[in-house]
């Protein structure tokens, strides 16, 4: 899945639209994702991800007119209460941290969004006390965050990251 992002400001409409598109991709590949997770874990991660995406989409009427920071905070709270367990706490931490560092209600460009994600991943890493190579979601999140961060540091356009 590739986010269809221009270099304009991101909005809650962007969050909702992409959550719906991600839901389709995840649902279409659920059995493959479950199989990969069974190789390194207990195979239930896909269900938590699907539940989390569904919760985000259900928030549409509540968050569509909110600032990005308030919308991300609503998402964090919904995920924390709706998923539960370690996945809920970790994904909730990701969105809560992104909400805290977004603090711009006028809009967020892709570089700010990337920095928000990078900070969120770092918070998840600290909370979960996990790193790359430990067969956790950090094996995906950290390399993605590093790649995005490197692209911003090199001042690459989003399409080139």
Model-based region annotation:
Residues 4-61:
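Generic N-terminal targeting/processing segments that precede catalytic cores or assembly contacts
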Residues 60-71, 100-116, 132, 153:
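Phosphate-handling active-site elements
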Residues 39-49, 82-95:
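Conserved phosphate/anionic-ligand binding catalytic regions in large, soluble enzymes, centered on
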Residues 36-41, 62-63, 76-86, 126-131:
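A short glycine/serine-rich beta->alpha loop
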């Amino acid at each position: 899945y590739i986010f269809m992002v221009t270099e304009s400001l991101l909005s809650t409409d962007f969050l909702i639209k992409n959550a719906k598109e991600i839901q389709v991709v995840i649902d279409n590949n659920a059995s493959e994702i479950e199989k990969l997770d069974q190789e390194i874990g207990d195979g239930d991660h896909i269900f938590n991800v699907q539940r989390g995406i569904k919760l985000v989409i259900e928030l549409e009427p509540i968050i569509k007119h909110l600032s990005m920071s308030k919308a991300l905070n609503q998402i964090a709270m919904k995920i924390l209460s709706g998923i539960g367990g370690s996945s809920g706490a970790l994904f909730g931490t990701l969105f809560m941290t992104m909400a805290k560092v977004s603090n711009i209600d006028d809009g967020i460009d892709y570089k700010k969004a990337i920095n928000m994600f990078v900070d969120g991943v770092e918070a998840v890493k600290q909370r979960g006390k996990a790193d790359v190579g430990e067969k956790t979601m950090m094996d995906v999140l950290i390399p993605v965050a590093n790649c995005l961060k490197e692209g911003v540091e090199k001042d690459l356009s989003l399409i080139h990251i």
